[in-house]
Amino acid sequence: MESRKDITNQEELWKMKPRRNLEEDDYLHKDTGETSMLKRPVLLHLHQTAHADEFDCPSELQHTQELFPQWHLPIKIAAIIASLTFLYTLLREVIHPLATSHQQYFYKIPILVINKVLPMVSITLLALVYLPGVIAAIVQLHNGTKYKKFPHWLDKWMLTRKQFGLLSFFFAVLHAIYSLSYPMRRSYRYKLLNWAYQQVQQNKEDAWIEHDVWRMEIYVSLGIVGLAILALLAVTSIPSVSDSLTWREFHYIQSKLGIVSLLLGTIHALIFAWNKWIDIKQFVWYTPPTFMIAVFLPIVVLIFKSILFLPCLRKKILKIRHGWEDVTKINKTEICSQL
C-alpha cells in the first residue's frame, strides 16, 4: 500500500503545473498599483520518503509532457533571424571581396561575422519584447475596453515575452565576450603591425583621430550600461527574485528599465555607425550595412512608445486598463456584429 501511495503522490506532483510568472498573469484584469504578494502553494500532504527514483518522471507521463513549450516560438524566431543575418553578413564580408577582387576573408567567419550576427539578433529580440505591448495598447484603444479578448497570436506572443528577453540577454552577453576577444586574435596583431608600418612609411608622428576616439568611447560606454540593465532584467525574472517583489515593483523594472535598455542599445548601434550612414562604400552590392537593418525595428517600437506616452493617449489607456469602457465604440462593434 505504501508503494502505491508513493507512486500516486509522484504522479500528482508531476501533473501539477508550476505557478506562472508574474508577467504572465492576467494583464487585462490586474491594476498596476496592486502590491499584493503571490505565494507558491506548499505541498504539505505529500508523503516524503526517500527513494532512488524519487525525482524520476513516471513512464506514463514522459510522453505527455512538452519540452519547454513556451520557448518554441522565441527559439524559432531567434534561429531564423540569426540564420538570415549570418547569410547576409557572409555575402557582404566574404563573398563580395572574393567575387570582385579575389581576396579570401574566410578567416572572418568565426569571430567578425558571428559578432555582427549577435547584436542584430539581440536588439531585434529585445524590440520583440515590447512590440506586443504597443500592439495591445493600440487594440485596447480601438476596442475601447479591456474585456475583449486579444487575438490568439497576440496573446501567445505576450506570454512569451520573458523568453524573448532572456534570449536577448544571452546574445548580448555573447556579443560582449566576442568583442573583448578582438585584441587576442592573431589577425588583429598582424593588422596592428601593418598599420604601424604604414604610419612609418607616411611619416606620421601621431595617428590620433579625435572623432573616432570619441565614437568608440561613447558607444562602448553605452553598451556596458545597456548590458548591465539587461542583466538586472534577467535577474528579476528569476522566480525566487520576482516573488520577493510586489507587482508594482516588478512591473516598473520590466517595463521602464526595459525601454531604457532598448533605447541605450539603439543609441549604441547608431553611434557605432557614426558617419557610415552616408559612406557609399558601406553599401556593398547596393545592400545596406547590418546596423541599418538592426536599428529599424527598435526605432519603430520607440517611436510608438513615445506616441502612446503622450498625456492624451496615456490617460485613456490607463482608464481602459482600470475598467473604464468607451460606450460609443462598444455600441458600434455590437451593431456591426449584429449586421
From Swiss-Prot:
Ubiquitously expressed. Highly expressed in prostate tumors. It comes from Homo sapiens. The keyword Cell wall biogenesis/degradation does not apply. GO terms for cellular component: cell-cell junction; endosome; endosome membrane; membrane; plasma membrane. Homotrimer. Heme b binds at residues 175, 268. It is a multi-pass membrane protein. Residues 118-265 form the Ferric oxidoreductase domain. Signal peptide: none annotated. InterPro entries: Fe3_Rdtase_TM_dom, STEAP_metalloreductase. Does not function as a metalloreductase due to the absence of binding sites for the electron-donating substrate NADPH. Promotes Fe(3+) reduction when fused to the NADPH-binding domain of STEAP4. It holds the Pfam family Ferric_reduct. This is STEAP1 protein. Keywords: Cell membrane, Endosome, FAD, Flavoprotein, Heme, Iron, Membrane, Metal-binding, Transmembrane, Transmembrane helix. FAD binds at residues 140, 161, 237, 254. PANTHER family: DUDULIN-RELATED (PTHR14239), METALLOREDUCTASE STEAP1-RELATED (PTHR14239:SF3). Belongs to the STEAP family. The keyword Transmembrane helix applies.
